[in-house]
Amino acid sequence: MALSRWGTDAEARELGEGIRDLLRDVLGVTAETGRTFDPAAVSASPSRLSDADVRALAAVVGRGNVSVDDDQRLPRARGKSTPDLLAWRVRPEVDCPDAVVAPRDDDEVAALLDWCGRESVAMVPFGGGTSVVGGLTPDTGGHRAVISLDLAHFTELESIDPVSGEAVLGAGVTGPRAEELLSGHGFSLGHFPQSFPYATLGGFAMTRSSGQNSAGYGRFDEMVRGLTVVTPVGVIEAGRAPASAAGPDLRQWLLGSEGAFGVCTRVRVRIHPVPEAVRYEAFRFPDFATGAAALRAVEQQGAGPTVIRLSDETETMVNLATSTDSIGEQADGAASGGCLCLCLFEGTAEHAASRQDETRAVLLAGGGTSLGPEPAQAWEHGRFGAPVLRDALLDNGALVETLETATDWARLPALREAVTGALTAALEASGTPALVMCHISHVYPTGASLYFTVVAGQRGEDPIEQWMVAKRAASEAIVSAGGTITHHHAVGTDHRPYLEAEIGDVGSRMLRAVKSALDPHGVCNPGTLIP
């Protein structure tokens, strides 16, 4: 990926007239207010490793798998949050990992962790580089240096069990590569988060990722049947049977551990046959509360769509105003002034049709109006494009970021109101109007996630701090309203200050005790996760 944007430079897009008009008329944002990225201004911090250190690392993984070059260290210095991308524009002096090291197998990972402990060098695992919560921050944690441990060699389909419906894949396999490898055997993983084009299976596991098809296939942590994690004190192979009463589930201690306990090198995942059929349908609801109640009914009655998502009035309005494809043509007028709900149904032709009929009946009974298949088809066609649009918005002076949370159905309205209010107030105090949009895209019998997209104008000399003030306000509102600090983005460094409020003092001490037992020298991704 490019340093200062999501994806590659070839994927960069220009803003359409509808978006430019919206930015100007609602937020007072024009291209003249934007900040551009100047590659010539970027400077990497010098490596703190000696020639002897590099030789020692090369003795473990081979000289070709160790680099202290700036062009290798810079891409691993930051993730892809809005503060990360703005930092390339306004903070060009970059704290980089001191080396990039790519082990080839578990033994080399273990040897690297042993060397890190002996030599007081921290380690940050690197998969696709898509963290949006500071998970890649090259924090030394008080050690003399920090390396980026790249999982680029862990990219194989190691085994597949079509009888059990399981496959073992390397932690460095990206989302598209996983689908390619599995489709050759007639299977799919079915995990499609926004980061799908670049993120890796190891990253999905270590951050408890949740994809857009979660209503049908579950979150990624539900797909993981087993995983291998190399820790500084040994290798953990967690997950043996489909269910077990042999004490606490070690998988759950490792899933979501964000590299703080060790390095995930492979996952065993649940797979399913490539769908025979995909059916689409969109609905309009008069307001968000009515739509949310209908989604709750769908989930609690077990109707079973593969994808179901509901945009609030503001997000629906913005999507229609900025659309250049059939979603605008088909839904404009029908969804204007209301909320757009999108559904997909996968499986055999009979099963997909049956679940569509059942879901439609529930949504219509709940106040929905069918808009036909086209809006849902258009959404699927462009569903990975939002980060690319964000790049163009940042270039044109807009401040754009997302955050997410979840709670039970009873508290969902109050949580949405609290977060929307906190974001709006904080950004208006910085001197800009704000568009705060929200959608539901992950539903459970007892509750749902809320995913917020915020668009405002960049103000002042430091738009990063402008956003961080708003993010802190939103995080405090989430905690006060009883939401989780993160539903699927992970903790990283951004959410760590709020974790203890969620898991309590005893929970925090449990995490620190496990960290101490598995990583006694504290070399594994310091500064991340652990309160």
Question: What residue ranges belong to the model's regions?
Answer:
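C-terminal substrate-recognition/cap domain of FAD-linked oxidoreductases
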Residues: 12-29, 60-88, 279, 284, ...
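Alpha-helix capping/hinge segments and adjacent helical runs
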Residues: 63, 479-491, 516, 520-524
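A glycine- and small-aliphatic-rich helix-loop capping segment at beta-alpha/alpha-beta transitions
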Residues: 83-85, 135-155, 183-187, 211-218, ...
